[in-house]
Amino acid sequence: MTFEAMFAKVKELLSGADVSGIGEHLAYQFNITGEAQGIFYVEVKDGLLHVEPYSYNDCDAAFTCSAETLFKIASGQSDPVGAVFLGKLKVEGNIDKALKLKSLLPSES
């Protein structure tokens, strides 16, 4: 899978996220490893969600993982905290803000 295909899928998965209740600015950078290697960011600002295929200088938290791990997290099949403990997701930066990523993700069915 190419980075472009992976990014389009992630953007679609996050498109339904309700960020209206998030009253603070959140900025996350995702560093994707493996076949779909690349960088993109997710930002919540002024009640709007932005997902763009660029790096984000001065982000609150940076996540590094494979596309497979990212899809499992973004679709609600895997818990991001659990992925960190399993070594599948690396997190750098503000951990308190990183934990708020869960509020953007679908709940597990």
Segments (PLM) and residue ranges:
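Feature captures hydrophobic
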Residues: 1-109
